[in-house]
């Protein structure tokens, strides 16, 4: 298993603007991964930036942490995320994945993504409190709304009497391994390669730029 950072984009992803800025780098990284022989890609963000675009660009499975986590959560799940401003984004994702009727609520803990690393103790306490609120209001499971909450699941579950907690990154990695074991590929009838057209301004995303230019040459 390997990991890579996008070469251009925001320091964290908390808004629709952040998603747009991150997507080209996500697609570029997915293309490079396939070229390097990687068998599946996981997008390390709960908002699934560039997910559909990456699936169009490659034939290997591309797993979105958000989609995989919501599907693993079962019924009556809440999303406990960094900021309340993400409520609309997660509601939109749940509808897109056909899971809106399973989601009870979205709770922001008031800790920005970058602060998850700088003050883990405060972030963990806020995550436990947000998860407690969700459980008290009827949630049967909690999905972390940020992969930066990695490692919090056991402590949150223990503090809340065994509440089911989905830690999105390891969950998505498991889904990727299963896709590889089952020899899955991206269905190109559903996610066809992009149509030929000139593009400008993406030279830093060399693999994405090359894909579009090769399609145009075809």
Predicted regions located by residue number:
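Glycine-rich, highly charged phosphate/nucleotide-binding loops
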Residues: 15-32, 122-129
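N-terminal glycine-rich anion-binding loop in soluble enzyme alpha/beta folds
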Residues: 1-24, 82-119, 209-217
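Charge-patterned, long linear interaction tracts outside catalytic cores
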Residues: 123, 132-135, 139-150
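Short, acidic/small-residue loops that bind anionic groups at enzyme active sites
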Residues: 55-75, 158-176
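Periplasmic-binding protein-like
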Residues: 35-45, 139-147
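A polyampholytic, Gly/Pro-enriched intrinsically disordered region
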Residues: 22-25, 78-92, 126-129, 183-197
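C-terminal functional extensions of proteins
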Residues: 174-175, 183-218
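A C-terminal functional module that forms or caps the active site or interfaces directly
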Residues: 140, 147-159, 164-168
